[in-house]
Amino acid sequence: PYVPTGYYGQINGKSLDHVTGWVYSQEPSAMFVGEVVAPQAGERVLDLCAAPGGKTTHLVAKMANKGLLVANEIFPKGAKILAENLERWGAKNAVVTSESPADLEKQFPHYFDRILVDAPCSGEGMFRKEPAGIEYWSTDYPRECANRQQKILDSAMKMLKSGGTLVYSTCTFAPEEDEQNIAWLLKNYPTLKLVPIEKSMGMDDGRPEWADGNADLVNAV
């Protein structure tokens, strides 16, 4: 209900519709992220951790192939898959880069209207789909991921225009990577304001008590 162009169904990855870019299969929660970013045609948009490209194709569609979308993936193998997906999708306004966020920030100081940081995370939300992920999880892993995510977010802030929009998302439930990272952002970048997100069925408020008690965290999803 929260993604006008999203439909439930079974998609064969080898089907003609998928191979030619008419459809792209992804989780409803992943599609929701693109709706929150809500890029507009003609804007400058950065997808900082973009591979394999599902959310990126959504951003391309919402921008109607107008403006500039920089899709970055630090790992070359992932960047190749990202480029293939964007080509299949018919993206004309996208540029694929394979840089660290720290290097990319030097090229685009305060340049983008909107930035999506779909951060690499501990992946707790994927355990139901990929049980093998449990094998590399440990009690220390969420904090390790959170430290890495903060470095990525710091770079993102250096590339965001004044008055721009930053969307931070993960596929984990760990407070260290979610509420606590948002609280870290608000503390270290006092000009940021946490904008309320309209919630749909199955979504819950952020939990201030899982971070520093900042009441604004209820605006997160």
Where are these predicted regions, by residue range?
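S-adenosylmethionine
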Residues: 1-221
